[in-house]
Design a protein with these regions (language model features):
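Conserved "landmark" site that anchors the functional core of diverse proteins
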Residues: 1-334
Length: 334
């Protein structure tokens, strides 16, 4: 464990996250972990390492003094990231050196940005995860003055790589039916698919409000027993405005669930900012399984999709560290 970054300034919602918890639902603890799992796995792929802990930055990052040479990876929401004032590419891995200053400002698009470091951030773990779950009082919310430590970097030479932005899409979000979907009329389900929702102001890691001029409230006073809920479930409270659950959702709920977002599309819900348009499309369970398998293959192949960053020499603060004359000849070889 090596001290790597000293926190000068920090946003109000910067936390340590990883893949979250497995098998804790029955104990009342939701999966938690990164709100955008695709961005998390992109960080892992860029760094060429396994399931390490990262910083999740909601809306705003912070300013960090570099205490140890390291590699960092940025993914998720595009933020104004700079190293000694020079802009850093998102969805890419970069090298940082002792004495430099890393600044990560406001998000330009999306909500959750991710900062990973070679070896991962080392923080206390609970039941196998370093994730922060504010509702359960677990994990770490990063504070100014704090020193962040990293583990052993197993691939220090892997740097200067980027991933294409594969997560942006304006296509409808794929949903499948739940045990409650049949309680809604055919006309109401059709309206649900046809409605262009906007992501409401109300939202956090527990879930986001879906606003429209339509009401999807059930009539007839059906009584729904409290049942297990998971991220992706779309609940419809009494007023009829749907609410999509995210990583830190409660584990049980008594509102009817009109649909459930496929896990591969949950990151798009999480990254929607207030006012963004969202549409939903029902797919069969068989189609959903095929879509999820294709997404799993894409994620497993992320490391292979990393390509070298094409950089402008005028923007390279570490120019002297590069081999710029490789392949020179004397002239008498012809």
């Amino acid at each position: 464990m090596t001290p790597a970054l000293k926190v000068q300034k920090i946003g109000p919602a910067v936390t340590v996250q990883d893949a979250g918890w497995r098998g804790t639902l029955a104990s009342g603890l939701s999966r938690g972990g990164a709100a955008d799992t695709f961005a998390l796995e992109s960080v892992w792929a860029l760094l060429g390492q396994g399931e390490t802990a990262v910083l999740e930055m909601a809306g705003f990052g912070g300013t960090f003094d570099v205490l140890h040479s390291a590699r960092i990876a940025l993914a998720g929401a595009e933020m104004d990231a700079r190293l000694d004032g020079i802009a850093l590419l998102n969805n890419a891995v970069h090298r940082i050196e002792v004495g430099q200053v890393l600044q990560i400002g406001a998000a330009r698009s999306g909500v959750y940005g991710y900062l990973g470091i070679g070896g991962g951030f080392i923080t206390p773990r609970f039941q196998g995860s370093a994730s922060t779950h504010r509702g359960a009082g677990l994990g770490q919310v990063i504070e100014a003055g704090q020193t962040l430590s990293m583990g052993h970097d197993t691939a220090p030479e892997r740097t200067g790589l980027a991933l294409p932005n594969l997560s942006k899409s304006t296509a409808p979000l794929r949903v499948v039916a739940t045990a409650h979907t049949e309680l809604f009329s055919t006309n109401m389900l059709q309206r649900f698919e046809e409605t262009i929702f906007t992501r409401g102001v109300k939202g956090n890691r527990q879930g986001v409000a879906l606003e429209s001029e339509q009401s999807f409230a059930l009539t007839g006073g059906q009584s729904i027993p409290s049942e297990t809920v998971i991220p992706g479930d779309i609940q419809v409270p009494g007023q009829g405005a749907p609410f999509a659950l995210l990583a830190d959702s409660q584990t049980t709920g008594g509102y009817p669930r009109i649909a459930a977002v496929l896990p591969c599309d949950i990151p798009r819900v999480a990254q929607a900012v207030a006012g963004d348009a969202l549409r939903f499309q029902f797919v069969s369970r068989e189609e959903g399984i095929k879509i999820e398998r294709a997404d799993r293959k894409l994620r497993l192949d992320l490391q292979k999709r990393c390509t070298a960053i094409l950089r402008d020499p005028s923007q390279m603060s570490d120019l002297l560290s590069y081999q710029l004359i490789s392949g020179a000849i004397s002239g008498d070889e012809i």
